[in-house]
Amino acid sequence: MAGNQRQGVAFIRVNGMELESMEGASFTPSGITREEVTGSRVYGWKGKPRAAKVECKIPGGGPIGLDEIIDWENITVEFQADTGETWMLANAWQADEPKNDGGEISLVLMAKQSKRIA
């Protein structure tokens, strides 16, 4: 039976190092993205594979800079909610053009698969 706690914050680690992630981080598990199949009626759905994705922002000027982030590939990413739910993304990569906008660095990390580990 679930308790009363709901997710409030998330902790994100890259190769074991916790990022200074700001409010609003998100995680999408790997799986199948479903799209409806329609004609004169709705017939069902079809799917296509979906990569796992972690999106977050970290403050600029911290211990990790854009030069390091740009080179991230074959990294291990861990997304842990304060509720204890934890997901692992092995062999992940930096998937977008990281940028510093107004003192916040935006990150998108992706992997072929994600696995719930807690």
UniProtKB/Swiss-Prot annotation:
Annotated localization: Virion; Host cytoplasm
Function summary: Polymerizes to make up the central tail tube that is surrounded by the tail sheath protein (TSP). Tail tube protein polymerization takes place around the tape measure protein (TMP) and is probably directed by chaperone proteins. Upon binding to host cell, the tail sheath contracts and the tail tube penetrates the host envelope. The tail tube is involved in viral genome delivery during ejection.
Domain of life: Viruses
UniProtKB keywords: Host cytoplasm, Late protein, Viral contractile tail ejection system, Viral genome ejection through host cell envelope, Viral penetration into host cytoplasm, Viral tail protein, Viral tail tube protein, Virion, Virus entry into host cell
The keyword Manganese is annotated on this UniProt entry: no
Deletion phenotype: No tail is synthesized.
Subunit structure: Homomultimer.
Taxonomic lineage of the native organism: Viruses, Duplodnaviria, Heunggongvirae, Uroviricota, Caudoviricetes
Cellular component GO terms, alphabetical: host cell cytoplasm; virus tail, tube
Main location: virion
Single Gene Ontology BP annotation: symbiont genome ejection through host cell envelope, contractile tail mechanism
Listed name of the protein: Tail tube protein
Induction, as annotated: Expressed in the late phase of the viral replicative cycle. Expression of late genes is activated by the viral late transcription activator C.
